[in-house]
Amino acid sequence: MEAGAGGAGSDTKGGGSPATPEDPRSPAKPAAPEDPQMPAQPALPQLPRRPRTLDEDGAPSEDGAAGGSEPAPEDAPAQAAGEAGPVSKAAAGGAPHIGFVGEPPPYAPPDPKAAPLLYPPFPQVPVVLQPAPSALFPPPAQLYPAAPTPPALFSPPAGAAFPFPVYNGPMAGVPGPATVEHRPLPKDYMMESVLVTLFCCLLTGLIAIVYSHEARAALGRGDLAQAEEASRKARSLVLFSLLFGVFVSTSWVIYVVVALYLP
């Protein structure tokens, strides 16, 4: 009796019989209807969301991170659109792929027999020239007879006919005879230098004799350039000495005439 009383007391204290484990295969129990007499709880105000930066757009929302659940449903379409962005842009642009999609076709040289078919020969058209107008005046007669034709370098065989003209000129690649230019040798003006030294001007005459001797020595050793330069200087000094002597002589004559015949 005590045990029964104790068991009943325990049931009354525990709030009924002990709880039996629920079967997961059993259907869910319907929710208890709300009592209309119980006062409704007021809804809590929603706090505004904190503005997020661009780096936080791809990160899961604060509510999902705090609850350990999946990202918010509003972030899922944005993430899906970001993943499909490059593919859709490349597909929409229609730009070809830069790399080779497959192996290039092997190179095959053209068949030499098919060359006449691909490139037909150029047709030979006869060239027709208009006759030249007749000259108004007859051509002048030749003053000198034409030079005789030089003999052929290689005589053709007997009875052979060539369809092309044969020229008996100098062979190509063989240099012709070198033309030698004969220039007159420069003059040393030695005699003129001595005369102007004696009768015109002693100083410039002596310098002219020096250049005349230098020109003669250059001619003796075959240096034509040095001989021409020395000869040109000797000639200039001879002319200067001659003009100076003529000027001095004329001035002396005028002075003598004026001194003798004028009071």
Swiss-Prot record:
Region (Disordered): 1-107
Segments of skewed composition (Gly residues): 1-17
Family stated for the protein in its record: Belongs to the CD225/Dispanin family.
Gene: PRRT1B
Assigned GO CC terms: membrane
UniProt subcellular location: Membrane
Primary location group: membrane
Record keywords: Membrane, Transmembrane, Transmembrane helix
Comp. bias (Low complexity): 37-47, 75-86
Identification of the protein by name: Proline rich transmembrane protein 1B
Transmembrane segments: 190-210, 238-258
